[in-house]
Amino acid sequence: MFHRPALQVFRQFARCQSTDSVILERSINKVQLLGRVGQDPVMRQAEGKNPVTIFSLATNELWRSGESETFHTAGDVNQKTTWHRISVFRPGLRDVAYQHVKKGARLLVEGKIDYGEYTDKNNVRRQATTIIADNIIFLSDLRDKL
């Protein structure tokens, strides 16, 4: 009865202990960002490659310095804005993002983080961090209704 599951566990253990084979294991690369769009999206297409919609998204971090750590009492409120480059490759989502994402819109973007490298116009190699969007949820708030 337990022979088959035990054998599967042993095989998995043996695969993990082998120095000659590739170890296959699950990992997670998931990002969720809630913020506002910095500029209207652009669509780019390199020769021979699929088009991509690109826009920036700002997220903010707030904290209070001073005597109290709550927002209801004295102390200075500090804010840090981080800008994220969002790239949308999925055909349906890419087109929706290009047509409907607008500067100032509040979005929830789900995707994965990608670290890449490119050569700029001065032939200097640069690092680039991009969020590859798998899903975009359009949110509204009071600013949209004023």
From Swiss-Prot:
This is Single-stranded DNA-binding protein 1-A, mitochondrial. GO terms for cellular component: mitochondrial nucleoid; mitochondrion. Residues 1-17 form a transit peptide. SUPFAM superfamilies: Nucleic acid-binding proteins. The lineage of its organism: Eukaryota, Metazoa, Chordata, Craniata, Vertebrata. It is found in: Mitochondrion; Mitochondrion matrix, Mitochondrion nucleoid. The gene is ssbp1-a. NCBIfam families: ssb. Its main location: mitochondrion. It holds the Pfam family SSB. Homotetramer.
